[in-house]
Every structure is written in structure tokens, then in C-alpha cells.
From Swiss-Prot:
It comes from Caenorhabditis elegans. Keywords: Membrane, Transmembrane, Transmembrane helix. PANTHER family: PROTEIN CBG09954. The keyword Transmembrane helix applies. The chain crosses the membrane at residues 24-44, 65-85, 105-125, 132-152, 179-199, 226-246, 253-275. This is Uncharacterized protein ZK757.1. The keyword Transmembrane helix applies. It is found in: Membrane. Its main location: membrane. GO terms for cellular component: membrane. The lineage of its organism: Eukaryota, Metazoa, Ecdysozoa, Nematoda, Chromadorea. It is a multi-pass membrane protein.
Length: 320
């Protein structure tokens, strides 16, 4: 429903009927954000890994955590109030702005692998030395574009009903642009990583050890760039109901779309687990943290094994 006789200063609310949905979203997204924080701490406590993977895996890990915080705090705020049987009240302008910020930061988090892909393309294919802050500059430009798209909801949008706010200033055209741009940039990241992987496998003539590490890291980055696309498929399917009026099962539209909220965890963990250097250290922590004394011997064995099987200088990955 579209409203014409209201303004941005009109008071709107988040209805109690939104409680179950936001609770489910927060349980999924909040859990992933917390685990993402642990992954950030894991890197920070291991300077050798931090130095090695700072512009690649750590950048994506920290970036997804930071960019997931606005949505995390919004969900937490709504869950607390709605379970207290209080409907949050704010102006349409405030609710629209918050919605725009959380939507844009979510998209920015999903396209983080693109900056890494561009960075590695220059290093691997073009054989150029690039500073680690290059990924920050590239992603800042991409983020600015998303924020501009989000703000355009104000001049181009209309007052419509919404689940999060009873009335919201919203533009279907800008939302379609945001979703399409997110998907397009993710596909571009996959394309670049495939190009890098093909180059490394066929044309890279460096020594065997460097070549092996470069192939491993390239495969890891390719896997990482595919995760945001895979977890967003249910949301893309759900958009057919929103834009074209196709009827979808209620369970799909209220539950399966939430796979998008798995991205803050699956995107960084996929690349971390695909590299033996990181995977063995993570396994060592899990074993030493959650198992009893008897299995700590296994943890020590895993640690020793990882030190003998993995290249002794993980910093060699920095040249990959």
C-alpha cells in the first residue's frame, strides 16, 4: 500500500507481529557475528598469520565483522523491545535512514572479496607490488556507491508499508539496483579469481613451493568469493515474490531467505579452512578448548604435525 498524505516526520512503529521474524534473523545473524569476532581475535593473537594474510583473508574477516555490526545492533534493539511488548517508535525519516544504512552495509560486507580479487590480480597476473591498504581504497569506493544508492531511497522512493516499519520511504527501483549490483560485483570477483587461478595453473613458472602456495591461496580466494552468491540465492528467489508478484511458500519467504545472514561467518571461514596453515591452528584451538586432558595430547600432536607438514614460513603466502 502506498501512502500520499504523510511526511518523513510522521511517526511510525515496528509492530509486535515482527517479533518472531526478527528473533529468528537475530539468532542466525548474531551467532555468525560472534563467531566472526572469534576469528578476528584468532588472527590478532597470531602475528605471523596476520602479517601474511592481512590484505586477503584477514581483511575480509575483519571487514565482514565491522560491516555486520549496524544490522547486529539494530536486530538486538528490536528483539529487546518487541519481547518487552513495546513497539519501537520513530519518525519515518529515522526508520528509513536506519534501513538504508543496514542494507548498504550488508551489501558492502558481501562484496568484500572483490577488493581482494582485484588486489591479487595486480600482484599475480600483472606482477606489480601493491600496498596492503589498496584493498581498503577499492572497497571504500565500492561502499560509497552503495551508500549513494541507499540514500536515493529518499528522493526517489514512496511511502509504503513494510515489515520493519509500519510505513517506510522506499524505492523498489533502488532496491533492485542494490541487489543487482551486489550480485554483479560478486560474480565479477568470481570471474577475476577464476582468471587468476587459470593463470597460476598454466603460466606461473615460479619455483615449486611458491607455485603451490599461490595455487592454494588462489583456490581459497575463489571459494571465498563464491560464498556470498550461494547464501544469497534464497533472497534472490524471494525477490520474485516482491517485484513480480509470484506466490512463494510462506516458510520460504519467512525462513530460507535468512541464509543471507550466514555470510558473516561462512565467507571468512571458507577461505580459512581451505588453507592447511590456518586450518591446523584452528583445529588445535578447538581441541585444546573443548576437549578433556586426554585429548589434549591429540591437540599437541596436531600442532606438531601442522608445524612439520606446513611450510615453515607462513609469511611466504604474502608473495602469493
Amino acid at each position: 500500500m502506498i501512502y500520499n498524505n504523510i511526511s518523513l516526520n510522521t511517526i511510525t512503529t515496528t509492530p509486535l507481529t515482527y517479533r518472531d521474524r526478527i528473533t529468528f534473523e537475530f539468532s542466525v545473524h548474531g551467532t555468525c557475528v560472534v563467531f566472526n569476532l572469534f576469528l578476528c581475535i584468532f588472527f590478532i593473537c597470531r602475528p605471523h598469520l596476520l602479517r601474511t594474510f592481512k590484505p586477503t583473508i584477514f581483511f575480509v574477516t575483519l571487514g565482514t565483522f565491522v560491516l555486520s555490526l549496524p544490522l547486529f545492533f539494530l536486530q538486538f534493539y528490536l528483539v529487546v523491545f518487541l519481547w518487552s511488548l513495546v513497539e519501537p517508535r520513530y519518525t519515518i525519516a529515522v526508520c528509513t535512514l536506519v534501513k538504508c544504512i543496514t542494507s548498504s552495509t550488508t551489501s558492502c560486507a558481501q562484496v568484500l572479496p572483490l577488493a581482494v580479487a582485484i588486489y591479487r590480480y595486480f600482484i599475480v597476473v600483472r606482477n606489480k607490488k601493491m600496498p596492503s591498504w589498496f584493498v581498503v581504497v577499492v572497497h571504500s569506493i565500492i561502499s560509497f556507491i552503495f551508500f549513494v544508492i541507499a540514500i536515493l531511497n529518499f528522493p526517489l522512493g514512496e511511502f509504503e508499508t513494510n515489515d520493519q516499519c509500519a510505513v517506510l520511504r522506499f524505492s523498489k527501483a533502488m532496491e533492485a539496483v542494490r541487489i543487482s549490483l551486489t550480485l554483479g560485483l560478486n560474480l565479477f570477483a568470481v570471474f577475476i579469481n577464476v582468471a587468476i587461478y587459470t593463470f597460476v595453473k598454466k603460466y606461473d613458472k615460479r619455483n615449486v613451493d611458491v607455485h603451490r602456495r599461490r595455487v592454494q591461496l588462489t583456490y581459497s580466494m575463489l571459494l571465498q568469493s563464491m560464498i556470498p552468491i550461494l547464501v544469497s540465492i534464497p533472497l534472490l528467489v524471494g525477490s520474485f515474490d516482491f517485484y513480480f508478484g509470484y506466490t512463494l511458500p510462506s516458510g520460504f519467504t519467512s525462513r530460507w531467505y535468512a541464509t543471507t545472514f550466514l555470510s558473516p561467518l561462512l565467507t571468512p571461514i571458507s577461505s580459512m579452512l581451505s588453507l592447511r596453515t590456518i586450518r591446523h591452528e584452528l583445529l588445535s584451538i578447538i581441541l585444546s578448548s573443548f576437549l578433556f586432558t586426554g585429548t589434549r595430547k591429540i591437540s599437541n600432536l596436531v600442532t606438531k604435525t601442522s608445524k612439520t607438514n606446513v611450510a615453515p614460513h607462513s609469511s611466504d603466502y604474502s608473495s602469493a
